Amino acid sequence: MKLRNIIISLSIFLLTGCLCGCTDWLDYKPKDKQSEEQQFSTKDGFYAAVNGIYNRMAGNSLYGKYLSYEMIDVLAQRYTVNLTGDDSYSKYLQALINWDYSNETVLSALSSIWGEGYSTIMNTNVILNNLEKDMNGEGAGVLPEREYKMLKGEMLAARAMIHFDLLRLFGPVYFRNPEGRGIPYNESTETKILDILPTETVLKDYIIRDLKAAEALLLESDPVLTEGPRAEYDQITMDNSMRYRQLRLNYYATVLLTARTYLWGGDMDNALAEARKLTDDPKVRGFFPAVDSGTLLGNSVNPDLMFSTECLFGYYNKDRGLIYDYTFGGSNTGNKLLVPRAGYVDGQLFANNPGDYRYQSQWENGSTLDGNSSKRLVKFREITDTAKDEMSGSTSDENQILQVQKFHGTFCSLMKLSEAYYIAAEATATEGSEVYDMTAAWNYLQQIFDSRGAVRSSNNFRDLLTKEYIREFIGEGQVFFYFKRLNKAFDNAYNGRQAIQIEIIPGLPFYDDKENVTEEAKEKRFIAPLPTNELDNR
């Protein structure tokens, strides 16, 4: 989809009680200013438009599938797939796991990511434009200044986040070619051709600029700073515009996203500075407490498999259990099944760590497509309603507990507090940086080990950090980008596909007939092609 052909279309999420409890949509395609002005003539109209952005981000083309648990994790060699299946979906998975970006279904999925990404970005620009009008007297003037700042901060962060992930997917390995072809950065509400900018320009001049502006606005306005995420329904006022902050790009999520972007650009000093805003503030851990092992492991009815108390940002999916059923296990034993190879999870990923809470709660016995014993991921499993039935007629305090239980059963994580500790650890472990301090690096990593019931199983820092990214973020979209950032090999210890260093398998698109694959050849795994129609007529 060409940027110039994207029609401004605000997908309005209808507000009924809970912020994200409804799935009805109103598609709005203004052909004149009157309908746009009507949309933004009330405070509810602004919130409906903003909720529409988050709902689009949670769609399959972005973070609800391709950029979380499916395409991006298959590219990251997390699973085995049916290598002999002849149906279109099997061929799609075969192409992904071999980094074959020429497959028609893969190209279609990439085009969907690109098109939906830029369409959503344009809609954030429409909202940002109307926020300015509302504040400077050109609009209806319906928003208090605090809410103007909060919504503007969220939309700047959303615009930056989507651009950043498009850059990470379609751009080069940054440290190898920062001046390489990047992507357009769209700040306009008009349909026009935008220049494709160098990667470094997109990252430093636009993405980080927007994130720092968002941080400043949210620091002055976000209730998460004083009241935490407030993941419960307000039964008194029925106004949830300031609640469920984990479903919004709140201040803390924006800080983590900024740290993530600095790390991508190799700026360890600033990455550490941003990460420490989260790791060094005791209030943050109070608002986003580590999962309680007793509650997690002792609860067979409705455990918090997503570790939602620690999540800074994610999305709502009332049908989360279907992801598990159709993709990771449940009733699925067919070609769509994604499970790691036999022996990988317990024999390598969690080797010497059988007490790790993630191993004990997020994985269960299953089998590969060829019938060998394996482990299957259950973090997306449906949470039963037994506890809800037992609480009928309960007191208001119990009702609040009930709301939290319902929340963690429908929540899917995109950002966890633990990532701030990993970023701080990597920054301080980088030789040559001004913040190099291996004692500090190990301390940051140890804090996560302690919160997971894990032990430090070796003195190889990079090996343990790599395994931590896989253990922590499988199904959440970060593992592929971790390997891309480092141009790192998927050797035996890090791939769930097969017990071999993947890079030396003959027949893969980048294989160069050498035992040791070149860095240039390895880089090809990680760079998705821009849609053909985006490059036409430029």
Model-derived features: positions:
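Conserved, well-structured interaction surfaces
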Residues: 90-170, 197-202, 216-218, 404-412, ...
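Short, surface-exposed recognition loops and adjoining beta-strand edges that mediate ligand/DNA contacts
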Residues: 37, 67-76, 81, 172-179, ...
